Amino acid sequence: MTDWTSGYVADIGYIFGYYLELNPQRVKLAFLNASLVAPEFGTACELGFGQGLSANLHAAASVCSWHGTDFNPSQAGFAQELATVSGANAHLYDEAFDEFAKRDLPEFDYIGLHGIWSWISDENRAVIVNFIRKKLKVGGVLYISYNTLPGWGTFAPMRHLMTKHAEVIGADGVGIVSRIDGALDFTEKLLATKPLFSRANPLINEKIKQIKDQNRHYLAHEYFNRDWHPMHFATMAQWLEPAKLTYACSAHYLDSVEAVNLTPEQQAFLKDIHDPMFKQTVRDFMVNQQFRRDYWVKGARRLTPLEQALSLREQRFMMTAHRPDVSLKVTGSLGEATLTEKVYAPVLDLMADHKTRSLEQIEQAVKDAGISFAQLIQTVLVLCGNGTLSSVQDEATISKAKKHADKLNTHLMLKARSNNDLTFLASPVTGGGVALGRFHQLFALAIQQGKKKPEDWAAFVEQILASQGQKIVKEGKPLETSEQQLAELTSQAHEFAIKQLPALQALKIV
């Protein structure tokens, strides 16, 4: 009998996650910062899309034609449901990579893989590389994220032990969640004996504690597949060489801000390394990199300084956060750093009204603050990297995408009546997903249904909870009466009206 799972965990679904780096709209800022030409994105593909939330949000929030596959039929079925509801140009399948590659597919401007590279066999990696070689256009971009060495070097033996316990000791027929719990309990008991391994690697105990608190669906796919291969950057480069790809830049904007990631001594050391690929490998040792999120390009083309500056000034942004809640702290590999208030505050104050502005308009508006263009670029990178600002699509794209985003968002908000699994909605303004918890989605649904006041939104949500016997948990205790629930929801609704609603309206979600 053929094992259609190829050693991949398939008896438990993956989490309903959204990964903003998969949004092609984010490529342009990263590429321009790296002085690279970015393509216009008309066709895109996601390989191993999981539950398909990212693929569907990106298809509904843009005019890009999306294709993708995930071999798990239950996950693909859910993804197809969302695509049907939105009516967006999304073609999602439940096929293995080699089957999918045989389809009559277009050439793609963009191909994305989030995480799966680390969890599949070398055979499947070869299939993916061949697919990229054939289907990624010249000038096209690959986004790929993967577990990285040396950061995973210490924990890899412990992961091997946990999976062996689940395989050898875990009882057949009890399911992967029980086997994971058993493996974690066993690991804790082992560490309690103070083995020399944990003395040599003192951070292992804390790592196991962190893992115990994580979603079991996530752990099943992150740690308990048959194949699990963290990889050095240089090894990844060797894999992608047959597809004619070269490294472009990190998809994680904060990686480009060296001051929060590397000491002055480390920055000076890296400057003496002239090979860009080897430089990345060395940098991974400096930051003990565990997970890379990278853009690769088929045929990199460099911009002149003038072309770079002109293109950057054309980029449009808006603030998606509530200004009083924005922190001037940022976390990099070196830990927490404080942002320079005299540089960041003028930009934040200007953008607090959630209006869309080009970088040129921002530059002109804050010119009296003495902020240089280089400082402004870094400010925007940091604020986009921490979710305070977002890139904005052109008006024609926003207009075309809105009807599909509206349909998908209504469907997701209706699902929020019964559970909190899906915590993102689509914005035609940013071309991607926006995080929004269950109650906030239900407040937005109440507004969509014509309710005007926070008190009305709260009553709407309280009725939904009461009909299902659901209670709000506050400070660890359930609220017992409907009056208590309504009071809590009313308080949350008033806060929502002040903190979230203005941004959601600017994002054209509400």
Task: Go through the PLM ranges and name each one.
Residues 356-366:
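Short acidic, hydrophobic short linear motifs in intrinsically disordered regions
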Residues 139-147:
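Conserved beta-strand signature within the Rossmann-like core of class I S-adenosyl-L-methionine
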Residues 126-138:
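A short glycine-rich, Lys/Arg-flanked "PGG" loop and its adjoining helix->strand segment in the class I
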Residues 7-42:
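Conserved alpha-helix/loop element of class I SAM-dependent methyltransferases that forms part
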Residues 398-449:
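Short, amphipathic alpha-helical interaction segments positioned at domain boundaries
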